[in-house]
Amino acid sequence: MSSRGHSTLPRTLMAPRMISEGDIGGIAQITSSLFLGRASVASNWHLLQARGITCVINATIEIPNFNWPQFEYVKVPLADIPHAPIRLYFDTVADKIHSVSKKHGATLVHCAAGVSRSATLCIAYLMKFHNLCLLEAYNWVKARRPVIRPNLGFWRQLIDYESQLFGKSSVKMVQTPYGIIPDVYEKESRHLMPYWGI
């Protein structure tokens, strides 16, 4: 159990691999049956086959599915803008990832860059099916794909979802000199030094 009273991921999921083509590229293994990546990963038939991926969840409005017959495709038509209603898809996508896993398949969730939309959906899945609080789920995904950065509207929706699931929230929106941001971003920004030029 974690310090927040939530269980952590099973030990069998504790050592995922990261297959990298650079920080922004590549595919990150989030659990034994869940992968997160950018759109170019979904176009790599050999990579999908090699990872045992059977379902591709496309969280974009701008990128079409490849519709190869070997894979099941799910389209989640979302723009990467703060007011996009990603919360409407949390349960549907999480349930699909879980269903694919129960059938011994694997799911790739992708958006354009694998940074905001797809990361948000993976975080929601970890909260629902692995009983992680939002902070734990975010840190878990970020450790495997360091470039993730859900937009501020998605954070608000994740915070609401966590409150619905667990009756409390582990991440807060805070006022900073940069505007209102999730406290996890505020903690990250403390390590940044302003550069004023010389």
Curated annotation (Swiss-Prot):
Pfam families: DSPc (PF00782). Keywords: Hydrolase, Protein phosphatase. Residues 26-167 form the Tyrosine-protein phosphatase domain. The keyword Secreted does not apply. PANTHER family: DUAL SPECIFICITY PROTEIN PHOSPHATASE 14, IP21249P. Belongs to the protein-tyrosine phosphatase family. Non-receptor class dual specificity subfamily. This is Dual specificity protein phosphatase 14.
